[in-house]
Amino acid sequence: MKKKIYKRKKRGPVQAKKVTYDGIKFASGLERYMYMALKKAKIKAKYEGQTYEVVSGFNFINPSHERTANGKGEFKQRGGKKILPIKYTPDFVGKDFIIECKGRANESFPIRWKLFKKYLADNELYHRLYKPQNQKECDETVKLILSSRK
């Protein structure tokens, strides 16, 4: 009788654990920590309160021979389709600031972050941006927000 070999599913580098606090499901413990720090400092900010469309969707009419987006499947004609928009939802949105908690950036985040900055510049929207990567930087973010209001 042959022994069955189970292949372990390969995990990506980002393994944030989902956490629930105050009835809100946070994508990571760092987001929950930021929420608690903002709440303690009485700074109003909405968690995932707004989604921005940084690149509009469009119809791509040209022929395009390629595999599916994940690199699998058959190499075939995949043009002539609607291309979906690129959207970005920051973790916290306040009156004049935006916070994105990123312990470890995934593959698409750096380009999405740059596109978001361009979107803000092109639309003349003024928001201070903060991107804390650990609890110490979350605390520093709160201090910076409070000092900017004096």
For each feature predicted by the language model, list its residue ranges.
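Electrostatic, structured charged patches in enzyme active sites and in nucleic-acid/phosphate-binding
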Residues: 1-150
